[in-house]
Amino acid sequence: MKQPKTKETIPSQTIVSDFFENLGNKSYFLALSLIIFIAFFVFKDFLLLKNVFQFKDIGSDTLNGMYPYYHHYADYIQKNGWPQWSFAEGMGQGILSGFLRDPFQLIAMLIGPQSMPKIFIYIIVLEIIIAGSIFYFFMKALKTTNYSAIIGTLLFSFCGFMIIGSCWYLFTFEALNLALLLLGFERIYQKNKWFLFSLGIFLAAISFPVNLFTYGVFILFYGAFRFLQENDFDKKKFFGLYGKLIMAGAIGLLISGPFLLENIFQVLESPRGSGGDSYFDKLANSPMFATSNKVEFGTSVMRMLSSDILGSGNSFSGIQNFLEAPFSYCGLISLLLMSQIFPLISKNLRKWYIALLIIWLTPTFFPYFRYAFWLFSGDYYRAYSFFLSLVFILFSVHALDLILKHKKVNLIALISTLILWLILSSISYKSNITYPNGQQGIQELKSDDTIAFFVRLFLVFYAILIFMLGKSKNITNIKYILLIMVVFELTYISQFSANRRSIVSARDLKEKIGYNDYSIEAIKYIKENDKSFFRVDKSYFSGGAMHGSITDHKVHSYYGTSSYNSFAQINYINYMRAYNVIDKNNEFASRWVDGLISRPFLESLNHVKYVLTKEVSKNPVWLNTHDSVAKFGDVVVLKSKFNLPLGYTYNQYISQTDFDLLSTIQKDLVSLKACVLSDQELSNTIGLKRLTLKDTIELNQFTWNYLKNSVDSLKNESLKTVLFSENKIEGNISVSKNKIMYLSFPKDKGWHLKLDGKETETILVNNGMTGIYPSSGKHSINLEYHSRFLNKGLILTLVGILIAGIFWFFNRKNKVAII
């Protein structure tokens, strides 16, 4: 393909042949070696197993979220195979969506839960290495020199998004994914080869399709920039390029079919995706051109200089918190180099650089545009910070290349930029804020003096070296010094983010603390003595982090009632809302659900047979509802006296309208007598008695005999389970008259019921759970779960493969490779 003309101000000179350029294609191995070198020293205590890559501070998601998440999948795959439904996700949920949130974690899942948590750091470093490698080839696709490509690769591999993101287990893959999309874009743009772009879209779709929007926004602007960087605007060619991207992207989307559909519908059908997001109206109605306050702006500025200059972990003094504040650090040298691009390119080309920079800087000054970038779903930075870093890296690498080619540095731009950053790093940032409790206060950023001194010192050194690149006749030694400084800076700055934290040590895994506490012996005892299906609630947390761990059951392999899930099963949440377990008006409450531990009557109704506690006196009700059956260390095992099986029957019902009028305790008590039906379902209740408001009782009328008699009545005609597994339940029931059977798991369209061998629809009971209408007599019950979109998704996959095959055939016919 004929290369477009370069639009530079100064005629290009020949790059001086030196060590870096003489390496040729082998320069990749130098870049790779440097990535591995820096990664080792940044993460050495974790790689050498002195510490475990888990954090007890604000990064507690590694302990409370991601570790239980992947441990559960690994355990599930070993016992059940392909992920479908799990009773350990809340009180039951399909888990195919989210299975490949980070496809590289499949390594840990297939090795097994015993590999966790020690294996996580190796997977993360592997992702950094692969992401950096892909970005190197992207740099070379832009025709940069070997030296500039190596510098750019290192800046990318150890930018703030990559390193802080690694401490959240999520963002290293997302950085890798975008690097692949950028390389794929260049392959389409330059050589009409679409495979890598399709692969990038495929990986995004099986991981988290929502990212396709943010990636798409970046590619949209980057694609226009690249086209106009090298061509005059030509409508046919311009939109033809986007047409190729859409076609290549469509192939990737189609091939991802089963995961794409499952992921999309999990989001859409969750509380977060189906409405009630308290943030949307607030953010969408905020003033468009309201500026960031001083602390918000200062945090953005300071975290461009270093991710940890405002403190690490819980000592962070900026807005939000250490993980969710802006983190656009991408090497100090990039902050000085990027201003050099403007005097070294033509006026016509300069306007496109300025336009791209304004597009990505605007949300830093005007938060409304950052909210819009996230579709007003939250006050996030994350990918936005990363994209801003990428623009800085691209500009600085191009500027470095031009300096090396032309041996010219604009001294005014260099000194002005240096002074600007020295001033920005030194001034005070404070502003009035309103705390969540409504109180007013003043927040002031506090910088780490050691890191701040290092930053200013290196800014000055970099400025001197950049100046010398444009003046010295022999710049090879300067290039060596500059590269050594970049390697040292990235190692020094990055190690704070991972190491200056509250960390789980290797010794912790051997002590009877954290997830290795006496809960293990307690659960083992229960399982040895009870082979049936049951649920367990805990009144304490095992995780050991600053935030309580409500997904202990995923690590200790038992079924509970709590959930930590951004996209929880909607009927599970509706049930919790209906019984006032969580705030029905707060969407955030749907992501962190403590379960039924504080509601003993609901525990009885939902097959919570055991409670683990360290303080029996914590809930006086337990003295009447449970027996203490064992103790291990400081953990007491309580067994319910009033446990109901998985399925039991009601002969009474109460309408949803009447139920909603009851107090919290009345709701619990009435559910011991009647199930709750929607008003639309009332016409199908032939032969059943309706319970009205006058039939309900108050707490002062409650007796323990009332509880015993109610439980005995419900249990009298209940499901006798013959087979129970995650995806299949078989049993028998005999009822004396028409009744409603309550099954204590959320109603889901993936469950298929056969009543006496005939396909039968389940009904919604108690505002979220599964119900069946058994008529008088004996019945066989067969329930099977099938991922709803697996078959439809496989059809999309076949269509995608067919289209890809057609593309491959015609490209082969025209002697054009696809890769």
Q: How would you describe each model-predicted region?
A:
Residues M1-L48, K237-G249, K471-M485, L802-I819:
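Start-transfer (signal-anchor) and selected internal transmembrane alpha helices
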Residues I15-G94, V267-S270, S502-S505, L509-V555, ...:
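Hydrophobic alpha-helical membrane-insertion signals
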Residues I35-F37, I128-L142, N146-N231, K244-I264, ...:
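Membrane-embedded helix bundles of polyisoprenyl
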Residues D45-K143, Y147-N177, A284-A325, L753:
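Active-site lumenal/periplasmic loops and adjacent helix-entry segments of GT-C-fold
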Residues S60-Q84, Y242, G249-L344, F369-W374, ...:
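Periplasmic/ER-lumenal interhelical loops and adjacent helix-loop junctions
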Residues Y69, R690-I819:
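Active-site-proximal, structured, solvent-exposed surfaces of multi-pass membrane proteins
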Residues A88, Q93, M485-I513, K524-S604, ...:
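Extracytoplasmic/lumenal acceptor-recognition loop(s) of multi-pass membrane glycoenzymes
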Residues I188-W194, S198, F208-L212, L349-Y515, ...:
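Contiguous transmembrane helix-bundle modules in multi-pass membrane proteins
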